[in-house]
Amino acid sequence: MFRLFERLTWLAGGVLAMAGAGPAMAQETPKHGGTLTYMIPADAPPSLDGHRETTFATVHATAPFYSVLIRINPANPTATNDFACDVCTEMPVPTEGGKTWTFTIRDGVRFQDGTPLTAFDVAASWQELIAPRPGVTSARVTYFAMVESVKAPDVRTVVFRLKFPTSAFLPALADPYAYIYKKEILDRDPRWYETHILGSGPFRFTEYETGQSISGVRNPDYYHKGLPYLDGFHAIFADKQSVRIDAMRADRAAAEFRGIPPAARDQLVKELGDKITTQSSDWNCTNMITPNHSRKPFDDVRVRRALGLAIDQWNGAPALSRIANIKTVGGVVFPGSPLAATKEELQKMSGYWPDIEKSRAEARRLLKEAGQEGLKFELLNRNVDQPYKYVGTWVIDEWTKIGVHATQRVLPTGPWYDALRGGNFDVTVEANCQGLVNPVLDVGKLLPRSVYTENYGFFEDQKLVDLYQAMVFEPDPTKLRVLMRAFETYALDTQVHALVLPWWARIVPARSYMKGWKISPSHYVGQDLATVWLDR
């Protein structure tokens, strides 16, 4: 693998829009006690292992049970470079020119079974994340190409040695899925955590009913003194938005932490008044349509381009934004970032032309040229309504306007991931969502699967890799923007490896008695619930 992160400049995504419902409140004194009930908008996670999975269904269900080494500062979750220790004692100053990072691990941290968490557990967990043994999957191996070794010389010290200094290291280290597991268990069965839970976080695991609910109680041995405030939590899986909204309306649930569309927010506010609050943010997340290049006729760029030309993004996004969690037409970069394409730049690429009739005429011409008039195929989708199923229904309708007929196969989250990873699909609706806004890192999703394991296009493209590496090595923001346009144009227009659909907008509703939670541009961050409290 090439040196993916050498000299990477960590570029934030510009100003992140944040808003809350109602005026700012004075600082309140948190109260202890009570059980928080919240909704998880999915049927079930494919597994419980944070190292393996990339879905919110896993992190929303399991983050309260686990510790991490470092994280985005919980008091400042919109930041892209404000990091805080969790099981370490303080953020270290690197040595050897930024190539050695030495962390001191807290004393007194215990797993749920009462055994102490030591530096050996931290090192073992990170070794599995960075270089998993055969038969074990880590979804973020690519992020850690800069790491040479992770070692624990004693029970309180973990040392990361890097191949080269890079400002990408700390953001990668702060991944919210990077749970600390017990070394003894990893040594015995490295896949144990796919179906079991044993952590050292603010809550202790009590019960999991697959696809139904998961529960935890306050960890009395939690090392952040005074936390958590809650006695426990109960999370309910529900893939239908109507079920989740009804639960909040009837106060059977206090919150949903992923996001709802404006129409649902307006409905709740109208019906509940000051009994409901909402927080809003830009969302570092977008759906993509990914053709499986290993299946005909999707190995033909003419067919892939035709699918993109059929979709009227400029008129579709405003209409869908009222009923779905989508908002902004964009390319591969988070809108608002200095590296994002302007509207004029986007409209030069196929799939973004302002004249939809011209686009569709070209799409029909390409299909005829490729011998694919009347093309029929199956669109794989995830059984999550917001916004997956809305987006799937939309693009299927758009494709009929060029004579293409797709049927939608909707699978629960676990089987959907199995189909993606196994290549068992023609074309799929998927997403590119990240914990931090970092355009150069974020667009790695478009790289070939041999470089980025969570790419499901099943293609190889050395030129795309070379274009990406040119960005990685470019420190000048102006030149980097030019390189990003070249990467984007090649990926989305020249080769059409994927179709990027409108970026999402995040609205998180909560009963007004739920306090202590702050929104961020990522629905992965801030889900351990340690600071949440109930004002009742």
Protein language model regions, located:
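Short helices/loops that flank or line small-molecule/ion binding pockets
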Residues: 114-116, 121, 242-253, 271, ...
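Surface-exposed binding/hinge segments that line
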Residues: 27, 31, 104, 117, ...
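Gly/Pro-rich hinge or "lid" segments in bacterial periplasmic/extracellular proteins
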Residues: 70-78, 171-228, 232, 242, ...
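Aromatic- and charge-enriched surface segment that lines or borders ligand/interaction sites
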Residues: 90-136, 153, 159, 244-247, ...
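N-terminal lobe/hinge region of extracytoplasmic solute-binding protein
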Residues: 39-96, 127, 196-199
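Extracellular/periplasmic solute-recognition and catalytic clefts
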Residues: 129, 149-151, 206-217, 234-295, ...
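Detector for C-terminal structural segments
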Residues: 55-56, 60-64, 198, 209, ...
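Alpha-helical secondary-structure segments
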Residues: 37, 118-125, 155-161, 201-202, ...
